[in-house]
Curated annotation (Swiss-Prot):
Role according to the record: ATP-binding protein that negatively regulates activity of the tripartite ATP-independent periplasmic (TRAP) ectoine transport system TeaABC. May regulate uptake according to the ATP status of the cell.
GO molecular function: ATP binding
Keyword Acetylation: no
GO cellular component annotations of the record: cytoplasm
Protein name: TRAP-T-associated universal stress protein TeaD
Species per Swiss-Prot/TrEMBL record: Halomonas elongata (strain ATCC 33173 / DSM 2581 / NBRC 15536 / NCIMB 2198 / 1H9)
Family in the record: Belongs to the universal stress protein A family.
Length: 147
């Protein structure tokens, strides 16, 4: 059924739920589990057009990447604690726009399913579906399960 399941993580409660669901599906299917954490790199153009908050510009990319790596490693550790064999789970960190990076990663790695949290770290609780989950669901080449 599924050979490669991808779970994007960002440290949010929604991502934890998605990881747990992804682990359950991995255990049912024996699929490989790919965990991806995307850190957002802010371009000079975005900065000059004031598309980002000033405090976001103060965080260097290395610090963002380190933080994303920590989140990805914690998610991988949690997946193995929940019973995924170590040789069946891999963690990745990429820089870029989250929705676009998730969709590209899923296509490049030939994922059969993306399991994503409905709300991420920037989630507005009043919204039914977060913008990243909505964009991924609308543009991924494979089925997307929103948890």
């Amino acid at each position: 059924m599924f050979n490669r399941i991808m779970v994007p993580v960002d440290g949010s409660k929604g991502a934890v739920k998605a990881l747990e669901k992804g682990v359950g599906l991995q255990q049912l299917t024996g699929a490989e589990l790919y965990i991806l954490c995307v850190f957002k790199h802010h371009s000079l153009l975005e900065a000059s057009l004031s598309m980002v908050r000033p405090e976001q510009l103060d965080i260097p990319d290395d610090a963002l990447k380190d933080y994303a790596t920590e989140i990805a490693v914690q998610a991988k550790t949690r997946a193995t604690e929940l019973g995924v064999p170590a040789d069946k789970v891999r963690a990745f960190v990429k820089g870029g726009r989250p929705s676009r990076t998730i969709v590209r990663f899923a296509r490049k790695r030939e994922c059969d399913l993306v399991v994503i949290g409905a709300q991420g770290t920037n989630g507005d609780k009043s919204l039914l579906l977060g913008s990243v989950a909505q964009r991924v669901a609308g543009s991924a080449h494979c089925p997307v399960l929103v948890v």
